[in-house]
Regions:
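Exposed beta-strand-loop-beta-strand "reactive/processing" segments of non-cytosolic proteins
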Residues: 56-106
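N-terminal Sec-pathway targeting helices
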Residues: 1-24
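Short S/T/G/P-rich N-terminal loop/turn motif that feeds into the first structured element of a domain
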Residues: 157-158, 177-207, 212, 217
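Intrinsically disordered, low-complexity coil/linker segments enriched for acidic/polar
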Residues: 82, 95-97, 128, 157, ...
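Short, non-transmembrane alpha-helical segments in secretory-pathway proteins
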Residues: 33-63, 122, 126-139, 198, ...
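Non-cytosolic head/periplasmic domains of membrane-anchored proteins
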Residues: 109-183
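Short, surface-exposed beta-strand/loop "edge" segments at domain boundaries and coil↔beta transitions
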Residues: 85-92, 158-163, 197
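Membrane-interface motif at the C-terminal end of an N-terminal transmembrane signal
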Residues: 19-41
């Protein structure tokens, strides 16, 4: 009987040892399954670099570890800028995703990199939404709204994105942004006292530049 238990104990130890070895191996396999290929990461880095260069925001470095997030998917790229570039461009300096000159750009996959995805990570969502809502008011007040469900900023190429950045940076001087990140809510935006007329003119200029599009459902 003692011999039986000795053999049984050895078998259990061998099985446990095997499981201990399999656990990190399984983790490595899963990690690689949720990781972009080196060629995709390289293409993503280059795509982001070229987009920012076309916007006159030349980066020093673009990088990503290529790991897809387990919850929700997607992966992060990090775009590093010089002090001069950050300090001379409010759109960068005031970006919620900028930390120590590094801009985090989240995309669903490397093929999703575009001017729209850059805008989505570069701009403050609260201010973007505020400008779209002000665009709705502008259309309504000027009789331009016709069964529109909502208005969006249309920034999908170098030309429109450059224009959009210029207007966005102007908007930053006309509003106060209240950080709601602590409660995980979109930031609240209010017009600075005495800046109402300038904001209305800004919205009109954005419309005339073709940056506000009415969408229908």
């Amino acid at each position: 009987m003692k011999q039986f238990f000795k053999v049984l104990t050895r078998i259990i130890l061998i099985i446990c040892g095997g499981l201990c070895l399999l656990t990190p191996l399984a983790f490595l396999i899963l990690a690689n399954l949720f990781k972009a290929s080196p060629s995709d990461i390289k293409k993503g880095n280059e795509a982001l670099k070229q987009i920012f260069i076309s916007l006159d925001l030349p980066p020093e470095k673009v990088e990503s570890n290529g790991s897809y997030q387990f919850e929700g998917g997607g992966l992060d790229f990090y775009v590093t800028f010089s002090d001069d570039v950050v300090n001379s461009h409010p759109v960068l300096k005031e970006s919620p995703n900028l930390t120590k000159n590094r801009l985090k750009v989240y995309v669903l996959n490397t093929g999703d990199i575009s001017y729209h995805s850059v805008e989505d990570n570069l701009f403050n969502h609260g201010l973007s939404q505020f400008l779209e809502e002000e665009g709705e008011k502008y259309f309504r007040e000027n009789g331009k709204k016709s069964h529109s469900s909502y208005t969006i900023l249309t920034l999908n190429d170098p030309e429109s994105m450059k224009k959009g950045i210029a207007f966005y940076e102007k908007a930053l001087t006309l509003v106060d942004i209240h950080d709601n990140s602590a409660i995980k809510h979109i930031d609240t935006v209010t017009v600075k006292p005495g800046k109402e007329a300038e904001l209305k003119q800004l919205i009109q200029d954005m419309d005339e530049a073709g940056l506000l599009t009415q969408k229908y459902q």
